[in-house]
Curated annotation (Swiss-Prot):
GO cellular component, one term: ribonucleoprotein complex
Protein name: Small ribosomal subunit protein eS32
One record GO biological process: translation
Keyword Secreted included in the entry's annotation: no
Species, as recorded: Spodoptera frugiperda (Fall armyworm)
Region described as Disordered: 1-25
A molecular function (GO) term: structural constituent of ribosome
Pfam families in alphabetical order: Ribosomal_L41
Family to which this protein belongs: Belongs to the eukaryotic ribosomal protein eS32 family.
Record keywords: Ribonucleoprotein, Ribosomal protein
Length: 25
């Protein structure tokens, strides 16, 4: 159960990181 929501959270974090990087550039 924990692994399931953890995977979803990781994906969201990755998406946020991508947006932040683009803004920095």
């Amino acid at each position: 159960m924990r692994a399931k929501w953890r995977k979803k959270r990781m994906r969201r974090l990755k998406r946020k990181r991508r947006k932040m990087r683009a803004r920095s550039k």
